[in-house]
C-alpha cells in the first residue's frame, strides 16, 4: 500500500483546533456575567482542550498573515489554534490564523483581506485583523461582518510598521494592545465546526486547500479507520505546494516547502497534530492584483469532499457550510457526524 498521497488543489488551506461544550459562570472584563451551559468542564472553544473557567468567553482573534518566502519565518504561527492556508495572486498562499488559547505578544507580517477570510472570521471571531483590502473585498467585509466583530486595520491600536523591514511586509500586530482597545467579550464563543467538533488541528483543500496546526491529538475511532499515510503534498499552484510528513515519534505532521523545512521563529520545524484538506471552488475575484494579474477567490460555502489526516492515517469525509456565517459540518462517507480526533 502506498504511504504517500498528493492532492491537487486550487486555493485554501485550513488549520483548526476544535471545541466542546461549556459549564459554569464567568465574568467578562467589564463585570458582566455570562452563563456557560451547566454540567460541562471548562474547555477552549477552538481546541476542545481543558481550559480555565472563563475559557469560552476569551476573545477569538483572526489575523491575516503573509506567506511570501521572503518573510519566513513568520511571527506567531506556532501559537495558533487554527490556521487556514489560501491561494492568492501570483500563485502564492497566505494564512488566516486563529488565536484564543495561546495569545502571542506579536504576530505578523499582517496582510490584506480576501473574500474567503469573511467565511472564516464571521462564525467565530471577536477581532478580525488585516492590513486593508481591495475596494470590492472591503465592501463585502462591511456588508457581511457584524458590528459585534471588531475590524482592526493598519493605524488601529496595536498595528504598527516594524523598522528595518521593507513595505508592505512590515506591518505587525501587538496582540495585547489591540485587545485592550476593543469592546470586551460578553458572549460565549463557538468553534468553527458544528458539534461534534474537531479536537486537534485541521487542513483543507479542493480547488482550494488548507493547512492546520493544533494541540495534542486524542485519536478517535472514526479517524483511525483511514488509510495509512506517511506523506501528503498539497499543490495550490506551480509556485506553492507544501509537503507534510508524519513524524510518528512526535505524533505530528511536519511541514516543508519542497525539501526545505518550514520553520518557526525559534528555528524549529512547524508541525501539527492533524490536517484537513478540503475541496473548494475557486472563481475569479473580479479585480486585478497590484501588478495587473489574475486574483483567485476561494469559495468556502456550499459542500464538498475533504480528507482528515491524523495519527498517520487519512480519512475521506464530506463538509457542508451553507452560509458565510455558518459553522462547518463534517460527516463520514455514510453521512454520520464525523468527530475529529
Label for each model-derived stretch:
Residues 31-80, 89-341:
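A surface/extracellular/periplasmic glyco- and lipid-processing/surface-interacting theme
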Residues 11-15:
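Alpha-helical transmembrane segments
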Residues 22-25:
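Bacterial signal peptide processing site
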Amino acid at each position: 500500500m502506498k504511504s504517500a498521497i498528493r492532492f491537487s488543489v486550487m486555493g485554501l488551506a485550513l488549520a483548526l483546533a476544535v471545541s466542546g461544550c461549556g459549564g459554569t459562570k464567568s465574568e467578562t472584563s467589564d463585570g458582566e456575567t455570562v452563563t456557560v451551559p451547566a454540567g460541562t468542564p471548562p474547555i477552549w472553544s477552538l481546541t476542545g482542550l481543558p481550559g480555565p473557567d472563563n475559557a469560552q468567553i476569551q476573545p477569538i482573534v483572526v489575523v491575516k498573515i503573509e506567506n511570501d518566502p521572503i518573510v519566513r519565518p513568520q511571527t506567531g504561527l506556532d501559537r495558533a489554534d487554527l490556521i487556514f492556508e489560501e491561494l492568492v495572486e501570483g500563485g502564492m498562499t497566505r494564512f488566516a490564523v486563529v488565536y484564543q488559547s495561546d495569545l502571542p505578544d506579536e504576530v505578523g507580517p499582517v496582510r490584506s483581506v480576501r473574500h474567503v477570510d469573511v467565511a472564516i472570521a464571521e462564525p467565530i471571531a471577536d477581532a478580525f485583523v488585516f492590513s486593508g483590502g481591495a475596494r470590492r473585498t472591503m465592501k463585502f467585509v462591511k456588508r457581511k461582518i457584524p458590528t459585534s466583530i471588531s475590524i482592526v486595520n493598519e493605524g488601529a491600536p496595536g498595528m504598527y510598521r516594524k523598522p528595518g523591514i521593507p513595505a508592505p511586509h512590515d506591518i505587525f500586530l501587538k496582540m495585547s494592545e489591540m485587545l485592550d482597545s476593543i469592546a470586551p467579550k460578553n458572549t460565549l464563543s463557538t468553534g468553527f465546526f458544528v458539534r461534534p467538533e474537531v479536537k486537534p488541528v485541521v487542513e483543507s483543500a479542493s480547488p482550494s486547500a488548507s493547512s492546520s496546526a493544533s494541540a495534542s491529538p486524542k485519536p478517535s475511532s472514526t479517524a483511525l479507520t483511514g488509510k495509512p499515510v506517511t506523506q501528503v503534498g498539497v499543490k495550490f499552484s506551480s509556485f506553492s505546494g507544501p509537503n507534510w510528513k508524519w513524524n510518528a515519534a512526535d505524533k505530528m505532521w511536519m511541514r516543508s516547502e519542497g525539501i526545505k523545512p518550514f520553520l518557526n521563529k525559534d528555528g524549529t520545524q512547524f508541525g501539527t497534530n492533524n490536517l484537513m484538506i478540503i475541496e473548494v471552488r475557486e472563481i475569479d475575484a473580479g479585480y486585478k492584483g497590484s501588478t495587473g494579474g489574475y486574483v483567485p477567490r476561494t469559495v468556502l460555502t456550499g459542500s464538498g469532499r475533504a480528507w482528515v489526516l491524523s495519527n498517520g492515517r487519512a480519512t475521506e469525509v464530506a463538509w457542508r457550510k451553507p452560509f458565510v456565517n455558518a459553522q462547518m459540518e463534517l460527516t463520514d462517507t455514510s453521512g454520520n457526524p464525523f468527530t475529529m480526533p
